[in-house]
A protein has these predicted regions:
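Acidic/His- and Gly-rich active-site-bordering loop/insert found
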Residues: 1-81, 86-103, 108
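N-terminal hydrophobic/helix-forming segments and targeting peptides
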Residues: 1-17, 100-101, 125, 167-172, ...
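Divalent metal-coordination and catalytic microenvironments
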Residues: 13, 64, 84, 109, ...
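Histidine/acidic-residue-rich, glycine-tolerant segments that coordinate divalent metal ions
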Residues: 49-52, 70-81, 85-86, 101-218, ...
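Non-cysteine beta-strand/loop elements that form the S-adenosyl-L-methionine
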Residues: 63-65, 165-167, 325-331
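Alpha-helix C-terminal capping segments
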Residues: 95-102, 130-131, 318-320
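Metal-dependent amide/peptide-bond hydrolase catalytic core
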Residues: 190-363
Length: 363
């Protein structure tokens, strides 16, 4: 196979980074590549598509998914700092590798939007499974800091559950000379922040196998007005856990504190969730099956000692069908994900396509 075609595609995708759920040019480029180089069936949906290698009377279907969206840097500029250009190019390359071959199965290549916000996997899994329910589903992510091309495996939790939790508390504004005449939300919001370590310990009992985190990303109360004691305040937290149920327990505890504190002080509150990701969990039986195939084909593997702390919306698929989420080493000295210096390494394209083709054939 001519891997220079895949490299050229990856570089073309790199030059047109697009926001989550707005991957219009990316989809056009990918579909054009597949039309020109394969005979795969293309099924266009709203904001996403899948390409199908169909065989008559095939007894099973294997699905492989890639994400397409870019991220923003601190200046609001879009760039492919997570390597989704590479993931999409790998999946298109897999389509090219399978062209004209008889596999004894159908293979569905899913090009998914909106991974960075967690919206894409939830929507696409629901829409895809209404039409086509795979017997096994694969996903992967490049991992800087690990040997190039090494397949990274982990049973049970591979990537953390996470969500963004926002609280808005409304009290009563007053003159700073008479703060007792008002209700400033700063005290309740501070009480919640200071209680977080104890809440976490109460849930996990200090078990290192039950990582649970709450990171304050923003706290804002009032304005820089030295004559006004604030009447409104907001607190934004990122909750993250190895186990989704632990994260949801912590969320309930925080909301209970907000409810109780507001009732006590005569204030009101509201909350919202953003960027909700489930935990990405590999069933042990699926992990053993994949590991056996990789070992039989003498492909390099490494077992991760702990889950990735970041989140990945492939977990939505794994809640519904058997499957496996893999890491692919991007190089031990490669720049980290979401950093300014990061770019997907083209040297990973060939080994990644080989890994996926091997698994698709053997599963």
């Amino acid at each position: 196979m001519r891997y220079e075609k895949i490299e050229a595609l990856r570089q073309a995708l790199h030059r047109c980074p697009e926001r989550s759920d707005q991957e219009y040019q990316t989809i056009e480029k990918l579909q054009l590549f597949l039309r020109e180089n394969t005979t795969l069936e293309l099924h266009s949906k709203t904001g996403w598509f899948y390409a199908l290698h169909r065989e008559a009377h095939a007894p099973q279907t294997i699905a492989v998914r890639a994400d397409m969206d870019a991220i923003e840097n601190s200046h609001g500029q879009l760039f492919h700092g997570c390597g989704h250009d590479g993931h999409s190019a790998i999946l298109a390359g897999l389509g090219l590798a399978l062209e004209g071959k008889t596999l004894g199965k159908n293979v569905c290549l899913v090009f998914q939007p909106g991974e960075e916000t967690g919206t894409g996997g939830k929507r696409v899994s629901r829409e895809l499974f209404q039409e086509l329910r795979p017997d096994f589903m694969l996903g992967c992510h490049n991992i800087p800091g690990k040997p190039l091309g090494t397949v990274l495996l982990r049973k049970n939790t591979f990537a953390c559950a996470s969500l963004g939790l926002s609280l808005t508390v409304t009290g009563r504004q007053s003159h700073t000379a008479y703060p007792e005449q008002g209700e400033n939300p700063v005290f309740l919001l501070s009480e919640i922040v200071l209680a977080l370590p104890n809440l976490i310990h109460h849930i996990t009992h200090g078990d290192p196998e039950r990582l649970l985190m709450a990171t304050v990303v923003q706290m804002k109360v009032g304005e820089r007005n030295f004559g006004v004691s604030a009447g409104t305040g907001t607190l934004a937290l990122t909750l993250r856990a190895y186990r989704q149920e632990d994260m949801e327990t912590l969320e309930r505890a925080i909301l209970n504190m907000a409810q109780t504190g507001c009732e006590r002080a005569g204030m009101t509150w509201q909350s919202s969730r953003q960027d909700v990701f489930p935990d990405t969990v590999n069933r042990p039986v699926c992990c053993v099956r994949v590991a056996d195939i990789l070992r039989e084909h003498h492909l390099p593997t490494q077992v991760l000692s702990e889950p990735m702390r970041w989140s990945e919306d492939f977990g939505w698929y794994l809640q519904e069908v058997p499957g496996m989420y893999l890491g692919l080493g991007a190089g031990e000295d490669h720049c980290g994900l979401h950093t300014y210096g990061y770019e997907f390494p083209d040297a990973l394209l060939e080994p990644a396509i080989n890994v996926l083709e091997t698994l698709v054939r053997a599963l």
